[in-house]
């Protein structure tokens, strides 16, 4: 569902090495399309979507951060007030899986305490031909670190919605139990309440269809 009315506003991050398909995941989720010529992100890309989970309307504001090491310090500035994180690796690239522990450390150190992190193995459509990271080893890492785990394909759309929805469901449970303060997350449909959420300053001024930074050209989805 798409609507201006929502009960909660959650800030999400998509993090992981460059080339894992983070921007493709963002655009598949927010625009319902796959863009094969997606470019490397410099700084961050932004998108949003309103969904209904168990009768509660939630607006997700999603920041897709640059994965290149030279932009790592810049990307860290986007962690403030994030409550949900998709930690993405490419199942056809073992190096990207080897980096998830460092990315996880950043999320847990810099984002909101208790941030919900889901480990996402992207490019599932290539597993049979080019897979380098098994489902078992990724799932083992997730269990050892208290993460949810899912494999996705931005190309086909498989499990993209489920990744975000499962995170939102856990967050709503945390709000209900008092583990996450609703005073920071409760927004409502009245525009005057938007100031109650402490997002990165530029977040409220960027539309869902805009990028917050320039990008460099590429021939494939190297986002």
From Swiss-Prot:
Keywords on record: Cell membrane, GTP-binding, Lipoprotein, Membrane, Methylation, Nucleotide-binding, Prenylation, Protein transport, Transport
Subcellular location(s) per record: Cell membrane
Asked if the keyword Cell cycle belongs to this entry, the reply reads: no
Taxonomy, superkingdom: Eukaryota
Q: Name one GO biological process term.
A: protein transport
Q: Return the Gene3D superfamilies for the record.
A: P-loop containing nucleotide triphosphate hydrolases
Pull one GO CC term from this UniProt entry: plasma membrane
Q: Name one Pfam family in it.
A: Ras
Family statement drawn from the similarity comment of this UniProt entry:
Belongs to the small GTPase superfamily. Rab family.
> In its UniProt entry, what is this protein called?
Probable Ras-related protein Rab-4A
């Amino acid at each position: 569902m798409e609507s201006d009315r929502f009960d909660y506003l959650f800030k999400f991050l998509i993090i992981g090495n460059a080339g894992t398909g983070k921007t493709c995941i963002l655009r598949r989720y927010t625009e319902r399309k796959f863009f094969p010529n997606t470019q490397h992100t410099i700084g961050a890309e932004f998108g949003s979507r309103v969904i209904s989970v168990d009768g509660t309307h939630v607006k997700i504001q999603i920041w897709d951060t640059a994965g290149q090491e030279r932009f790592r310090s810049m990307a860290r500035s986007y962690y403030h007030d994030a409550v949900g994180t998709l930690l993405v690796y490419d199942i056809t690239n073992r190096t990207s899986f080897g980096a998830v522990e460092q990315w996880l450390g950043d999320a847990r150190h810099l984002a909101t305490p208790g941030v919900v992190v889901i480990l996402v193995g992207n490019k599932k459509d290539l597993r049979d031909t080019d897979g380098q990271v098994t489902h078992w080893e990724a799932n083992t890492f997730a269990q050892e670190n208290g993460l949810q785990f899912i494999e996705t394909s931005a190309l086909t759309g498989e499990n993209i919605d489920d990744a975000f929805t499962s995170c939102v469901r856990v967050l709503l449970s945390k709000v209900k139990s008092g583990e996450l303060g609703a005073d920071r997350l409760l927004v409502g449909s009245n525009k005057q309440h938007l100031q109650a959420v402490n997002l990165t300053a530029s977040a409220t001024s960027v539309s869902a269809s805009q990028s917050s930074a320039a990008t460099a050209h590429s021939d494939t989805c190297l986002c």
